[in-house]
Amino acid sequence: MANSKSAKKRALQSEKRRQHNASRSSMLRTYVKKVIAAINAGDHESATAAFVTAQPIVDRMATKGLIHKNKAARYKSRLNAKIKALAA
């Protein structure tokens, strides 16, 4: 338990950040799941549309430090490859 005033403040800030990051992480997973669901359904148009909306979200989370920039690149690359495979 935090004893000093500054430690209490840091504990409050930490909890606030944890909740905020959890919310953003959930949002990221939701957008990625929408793309994956469209890919699994075999619908190229809706998969592309979902990917276009998910792409800036993934980039933003990488910028905010929620995920590593290489992980963001990996997400985008793999999803895009699956979408291209649908078109072929």
Curated annotation (Swiss-Prot):
Record field: compositional bias (Basic residues): 1-21
GO biological process: translation
GO CC terms: cytosol; small ribosomal subunit
Span list, region Disordered: 1-27
MF annotations from Gene Ontology: small ribosomal subunit rRNA binding; structural constituent of ribosome
Entry keywords, A to Z: Ribonucleoprotein, Ribosomal protein, RNA-binding, rRNA-binding
Claim: rRNA-binding is one of the keywords in the record: yes
Intrachain S-S bonds: none
Organism superkingdom: Bacteria
Role this protein plays: Binds directly to 16S ribosomal RNA.
Cited HAMAP family: Ribosomal_bS20 (MF_00500)
PANTHER family linked: 30S RIBOSOMAL PROTEIN S20, SMALL RIBOSOMAL SUBUNIT PROTEIN BS20C
Record-stated family: Belongs to the bacterial ribosomal protein bS20 family.
Protein name: Small ribosomal subunit protein bS20
Species of origin: Shewanella piezotolerans (strain WP3 / JCM 13877)
